[in-house]
Swiss-Prot record:
Mg(2+) binds at K204, D206, E207. Keywords: Calvin cycle, Carbon dioxide fixation, Lyase, Magnesium, Metal-binding, Monooxygenase, Oxidoreductase, Plasmid. The modification N6-carboxylysine is found at K204. Its cofactor is Mg(2+). The gene is cbbL. PROSITE patterns: RUBISCO_LARGE. Substrate binds at N126, T176, K180, R297, H329, S381. It comes from Rhizobium meliloti (strain 1021) (Ensifer meliloti). This is Ribulose bisphosphate carboxylase large chain.
């Protein structure tokens, strides 16, 4: 692209009928200094052969704001200089020829207050299908404080949840009921009771258990809450079960949520696939009814896993904090699901910090002030077991729910023993950490010492102690070498 093609055309020539380059229409400005009130998006773009990266960046800015493929005179009926998004920086992606990071600034006036649906319609609504790009990925966003303040965020937050549970200074423990499909309501409730009695704080529904022929949702709720109440009475601890209210319509979701509330549940769950409007709607219901909202990120891997195209999960986490969820599955790094340890830590930081600093090794490109929005409790779930407790505590600290589904239900001595093994492993590791021991390196030794007086933990370590999922992550930082969790 020649120099003129990168320069904005001014005056009458700008609005003559015809086709101009996006940069010529004003969607590229290398001298632009973003305002504090601008929303900034960072895209990873792979232009088609022969497409200049600056023109590709300008096209992203144009197609995600006000542009179309040709000049339209009706631009002059608007404050078009203000409304145009502006690509202002393009950097080659380190070590990846043909890919570029492009920074695009959007004036805040382009977005409806408090609406993730509107935000996503602009930022990801059109550009990902644009022919001049082989691929595009939304890597990160900076959300201005003025925009953050239009959202209400999590209905409960970490602090209030811990106060309700009376649990402080250590991770919470949970498990997903297995098998996730096929159990009758009564047997399902039995699994819930055994897990809670054995020492877990929560049990949960999985993403695809809704209301199938083998178990109506109402039956599941009744048996699960019976299990919760019985386990609470027996142990003297506050217990809970994440009742999945995901359904085909909002009306049905509200109906299930109301029934869960009537039964005394303190928490309900929805899947990410219900959509942004449904998430914000049920979040508002939870706020009005003093309920914790658990978010299962079902389906996210279809657009977050590939490094060259889609949306980074750190962006999804930011949107979900705005939308208002209390719990969010955010990866384990050491389990069976995709997750580079530093990258996953970046997701956790998005959930738990009041201000994110720039942290390129963890994938955070911008400072992000959360304007006192409540914190989200990250959830580590998927292929984890008691033998990894030292890794999990070292990676994620205290404010996390550690969910051992198969690592509880699959215990050779039974479900209650599986829960007890996880509880003892956690308590032993927290104690060792608080005594100043190096749990990252001494973890296996600490666990074996605890197992000498806990047969369930000994059995768990014997059967799963050497199980790991050390595959090369696909979504890693571009600024540091990838590491493994081992």
């Amino acid at each position: 692209m020649n120099a003129d093609a990168k320069t904005e055309i001014k005056g009458r020539e700008r609005y003559k009928a015809g086709v101009l380059k996006y940069a010529q229409m004003g969607y590229w400005n290398g001298d632009y200094e973003p305002k504090d009130t601008d929303l900034i998006a960072l895209f990873r773009i792979t232009p088609q052969d022969g497409v200049d990266p600056i023109e590709a960046a300008a096209a992203v800015a144009g197609e995600s704001s006000t542009a179309t493929w040709t000049v339209v005179w009706t631009d002059r009926l608007t404050a078009c200089d203000q409304y145009r998004a502006k690509a202002y920086r393009v950097d080659p992606v380190p070590g990846t020829p043909g890919q570029y990071f492009c920074y695009v600034a959007y004036d805040l006036i382009l977005f409806e207050e408090g609406s993730i649906a509107n935000l996503t319609a602009s930022i990801i609504g059109n550009v990902f299908s644009f022919k001049p790009l082989k691929a595009a990925r939304l890597e990160d966003m900076r959300l201005p404080v003025a925009y953050v303040k239009t959202f209400r965020g999590p209905p409960t937050g970490i602090v209030v949840e811990r106060e309700r549970l009376d649990k402080f200074g250590k991770p919470l423990l949970g498990a997903t009921t297995k098998p996730k499909l096929g159990l009758s309501g009564k047997n399902y409730g039995r699994v819930v009771y055994e897990g809670l009695k054995g020492g877990l704080d929560f049990m949960k529904d999985d993403e695809n258990i809704n209301s199938q022929p083998f178990m109506h949702w109402r039956d599941r709720y009744l048996y699960c809450m019976e299990a919760v109440n019985h386990a609470s009475a027996v142990t003297g601890e506050v217990k809970g079960h994440y009742l999945n209210i995901t359904a085909g319509t909002m009306e049905e979701m509200y109906r299930r949520a109301e029934f869960a509330k009537e039964l005394g549940s303190v928490i309900v769950m929805v899947d990410l696939i219900v959509g942004w409007t449904a998430i914000q709607s049920i979040s508002e219901w939870c706020r009005q009814n003093d309920m914790i909202l658990h978010m299962h990120r079902a389906g996210h891997g279809t657009y977050t896993r590939q490094k060259n195209h889609g949306i980074s999960f750190r962006v999804i986490a930011k949107w979900l904090r705005l939308a208002g969820v209390d719990h969010l599955h955010a990866g384990t790094a050491v389990g069976k699901l995709e997750g580079d340890p530093p990258t996953v830590q970046g997701y956790y930081n998005v959930c738990r910090e009041m201000k994110n600093e720039v942290d390129l090794p963890r994938g955070l490109f911008f400072e992000q002030d959360w304007a006192d929005l409540k914190k989200v409790m990250p959830v580590a779930s998927g292929g984890i077991h008691a033998g990894q407790m030292h890794q999990l505590l070292d990676l994620f600290g205290d404010d996390v729910v550690l969910q051992f589904g198969g690592g509880t239900i699959g215990h050779p001595m039974g479900i209650q023993a599986g829960a007890t093994a996880n509880r003892v492993a956690l308590e032993a590791m927290v104690l060792a950490r608080n005594e100043g021991r190096d749990i990252a390196h001494e973890g296996p030794e600490i666990l074996r010492a605890a197992a000498k007086w806990c047969k369930p933990l000994e059995a768990a370590l014997d059967i799963w102690g050497n199980i790991s999922f050390n595959y090369t992550p696909t979504d890693t930082s571009d600024f540091v070498p990838s590491v493994t969790a081992a």
